[in-house]
Amino acid sequence: MKRAFIMVLDSFGIGATEDAERFGDVGADTLGHIAEACAKGEADNGRKGPLNLPNLTRLGLAKAHEGSTGFIPAGMDGNAEVIGAYAWAHEMSSGKDTPSGHWEIAGVPVLFEWGYFSDHENSFPQELLDKLVERANLPGYLGNCHSSGTVILDQLGEEHMKTGKPIFYTSADSVFQIACHEETFGLDKLYELCEIAREELTNGGYNIGRVIARPFIGDKAGNFQRTGNRHDLAVEPPAPTVLQKLVDEKHGQVVSVGKIADIYANCGITKKVKATGLDALFDATIKEMKEAGDNTIVFTNFVDFDSSWGHRRDVAGYAVGLELFDRRLPELMSLLRDDDILILTADHGCDPTWTGTDHTREHIPVLVYGPKVKPGSLGHRETFADIGQTLAKYFGTSDMEYGKAMF
């Protein structure tokens, strides 16, 4: 019986890549800088002392970071016994965004350039805005700028509730984001608006990776909160991923936990499970692992590392999340059967000590564990697609066009 369990710690980079200069990210190091802050006592909010990740360390995390940067993260044990196989992987894709990272993990790197809305004010073409107002019968719109998702709620949330005008905003990523109040505007209405935006962006040739519904609740600035009903409308991957091949060629099952299905535009996904927050995502993952049959992938995205702590530049929060993940990791490991493999990885970096609020171009960790997986270094991987090619070989599907199997 063959089963693979893929856990993406969204944004958990382990040091800048060789091409980081192109992105303004030379020196970025999500894990390294979090560990450094913890070791200095600068991340003692909700936790205390050096970063404590014994289980991830046993799977090779500290060694993978050493391979990427040349040093063991501050306060972590570089001499701990390693029971997993580990690597650090470079991104072949042109961007440092979520779809690019995930698609490349599944064997399909993004070798084209996404479209972006680069102007920080008046970010969107008037023609596009006019079509959205007309088609969705809107009273107007707010925002039309680059912004952090939480900041813009404090700035415009009250006006949105009074006027019914949706908040349109973007970032350095290839995204069109729409924030609306779940109750005063309505969740279904927001989703319908996002569908219209997705159509217009696709038909207009803007080449934008994702439209993101950003519902929120609250009644005034300072207490607005985004809810777990986020929905991403992505374009489809440009070629069949290893997920699609498993389904098509082996009649396999691919279970999405969290936002995975959205990222792949539902391509190669046979079951979707929604969950919000680290503990709920863990619980849902464990349930699906227990029920998984032969030729099954359970694929989970732990989005909070990115959305709650990386983008918000919350070092202590990120550390709390990592330590929670580490404490619960043995629950996943204990469920593995003889032929199973567990892969822990990331899709990009988002260094919470870095300037701005955007992602960072970093190596990702690739930590592989299973009863039949030989422990030790798998070295520097030239593309995240090595993960996809490894899965293709493991399940016996046709080869992926990119990547080399790691074992």
From Swiss-Prot:
Location (main, coarse): cytoplasm
Sequence similarity: Belongs to the phosphopentomutase family.
Cellular compartments annotated: Cytoplasm
Alphabetical GO biological process terms: 2-deoxyribose 1-phosphate catabolic process; 5-phosphoribose 1-diphosphate biosynthetic process; metabolic compound salvage; nucleotide metabolic process
A single GO cellular-component term on record: cytosol
SUPFAM superfamilies for the chain: Alkaline phosphatase-like, DeoB insert domain-like
Keywords: Cytoplasm, Isomerase, Manganese, Metal-binding
Superkingdom to which the source organism belongs: Bacteria
E.C. no: 5.4.2.7
Catalytic activity: 2-deoxy-alpha-D-ribose 1-phosphate = 2-deoxy-D-ribose 5-phosphate; alpha-D-ribose 1-phosphate = D-ribose 5-phosphate
Co-factor remark: Binds 2 manganese ions.
Described purpose of this protein according to its UniProt entry: Isomerase that catalyzes the conversion of deoxy-ribose 1-phosphate (dRib-1-P) and ribose 1-phosphate (Rib-1-P) to deoxy-ribose 5-phosphate (dRib-5-P) and ribose 5-phosphate (Rib-5-P), respectively.
UniProt GO molecular function: magnesium ion binding; manganese ion binding; phosphopentomutase activity
Database matches in PANTHER family: PHOSPHOPENTOMUTASE
Protein's UniProt name: Phosphopentomutase
Pathway terms, separated by semicolons: Carbohydrate degradation; 2-deoxy-D-ribose 1-phosphate degradation; D-glyceraldehyde 3-phosphate and acetaldehyde from 2-deoxy-alpha-D-ribose 1-phosphate: step 1/2
Residue numbers binding Mn(2+) 1: D10, D347, H348
Binding-site residues, Mn(2+) 2: D306, H311, H359
Cofactor(s), by name: Mn(2+)
Pfam families: Metalloenzyme
